[in-house]
């Protein structure tokens, strides 16, 4: 039995790719067809590759490997924090700071600074300081919590990195490749599959698609660590997040009718209405150049 059924993927909009003009030709093997100018991902292959990813992640978790989730886009940030916390992983969901992995020594000192400030704040020391000094320390604490809060328990470089939107997280991909860390990633139709080790062809823009795939990977980590899937589940749109989810202006993509998708996919029983992939921000079109920077330094 597959880890995720075709019906679940159709309902979550996993099959919706980008407009055909935005595609990466290397994704051609994973594309089923084109409908109204939009590429439709082959869900049969997605199901097979999801099974492979699930078993790989579960096996790695059983052997004690540590996982880092990376997803800084608005649709993914809350899901990343939620699922990483549930399965005992680490996460970056605000901004990837240059050198987060390749300059781990510096990052580790900033994490220790974060822990020290938290201890001082909780003990009430901030209240005893001059108002201006206390205000500066609170701002520093807030900044460190924002960018490094998901790494507080990470004592060494992780063994496996799970990434949402490898084009947006290009710097993270580069650092993983430099260190030889395996990458598990959702691949939309505009991605380059050569960048990752464990590909999962899927819509990486729709919240429900991201939640479905990342939730299953978190299940695999939890199962590998504890021998069973966590009973803690999150239904619907109950996604805690440190930031607001604002609707982005969608790409002018034509809707694909349910009956049409069902006819195009012979193995699917029905095709419920799914979310269309929103247009990427223009800044994401070009892969940014990796830069070395000291994180969260005042």
From Swiss-Prot:
Its keywords, alphabetically, are: Ribonucleoprotein, Ribosomal protein
- Stretches of Acidic residues bias are at 234-250
Task: Identify the stretch(es) annotated as Disordered.
Answer: 232-298
Q: What domain of life does the UniProt record list for this protein's source? A: Bacteria
| Entry's Gene Ontology cellular component terms | cytosolic small ribosomal subunit
Matching entries from SUPFAM superfamilies are given as: Ribosomal protein S2
- Pfam families reported for this sequence: Ribosomal_S2
Q: Return the Low complexity bias intervals.
A: 251-276
Gene3D superfamilies membership: Glucose-6-phosphate isomerase like protein, domain 1, Helix hairpin bin
Q: Does the keyword Chloroplast apply?
A: no
One of the record's GO molecular function terms: structural constituent of ribosome
Q: Which InterPro entries match?
A: Ribosomal_uS2, Ribosomal_uS2_bac/mit/plastid, Ribosomal_uS2_CS, Ribosomal_uS2_flav_dom_sf
Q: Name one GO biological process term.
A: translation
Q: Which NCBIfam families match?
A: rpsB_bact (TIGR01011)
> Which family does the UniProt entry place this protein in?
Belongs to the universal ribosomal protein uS2 family.
- How is this protein named in the record? Small ribosomal subunit protein uS2
* Species in which this protein is naturally found: Acaryochloris marina (strain MBIC 11017)
Primary gene name: rpsB
């Amino acid at each position: 039995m597959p880890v995720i059924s075709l019906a679940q993927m159709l309902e979550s909009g996993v099959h919706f790719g980008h407009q055909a003009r935005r595609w990466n030709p290397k994704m051609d093997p994973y594309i089923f067809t084109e409908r109204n100018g939009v590429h439709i991902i082959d869900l049969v292959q997605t199901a097979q590759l999801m099974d492979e990813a699930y078993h790989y992640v579960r096996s790695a978790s059983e052997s004690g490997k540590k996982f880092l989730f990376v997803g800084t886009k608005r649709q993914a940030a809350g899901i990343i924090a939620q699922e990483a916390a549930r399965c005992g992983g680490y996460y970056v969901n605000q901004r990837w700071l240059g050198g987060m992995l390749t300059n781990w020594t510096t990052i580790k000192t900033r994490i220790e600074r974060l822990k020290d400030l938290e201890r001082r704040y909780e003990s009430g020391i901030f209240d005893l300081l001059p108002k201006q000094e206390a205000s500066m320390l609170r701002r520093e604490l807030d900044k460190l919590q924002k960018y490094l809060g998901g790494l507080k328990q990470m004592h060494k470089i992780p063994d496996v990195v799970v990434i949402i939107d490898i084009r947006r997280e290009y710097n993270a991909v580069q650092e993983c490749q430099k260190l030889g860390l395996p990458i598990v990633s959702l691949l939309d139709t505009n991605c380059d599959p050569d960048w990752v080790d464990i590909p999962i062809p899927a819509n990486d823009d729709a919240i429900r698609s991201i939640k479905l795939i990342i939730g299953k990977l978190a299940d695999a980590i939890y199962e590998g660590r504890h021998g069973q899937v966590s009973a803690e589940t999150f239904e619907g749109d109950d996604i805690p997040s440190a930031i607001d989810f604002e609707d982005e202006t969608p790409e002018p993509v034509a809707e694909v009718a349910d009956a049409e998708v069902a006819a195009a996919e012979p193995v699917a029983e029905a095709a419920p209405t799914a979310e269309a992939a929103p247009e990427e921000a223009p800044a994401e079109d070009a892969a940014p150049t990796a830069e070395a920077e000291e994180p969260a330094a005042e």
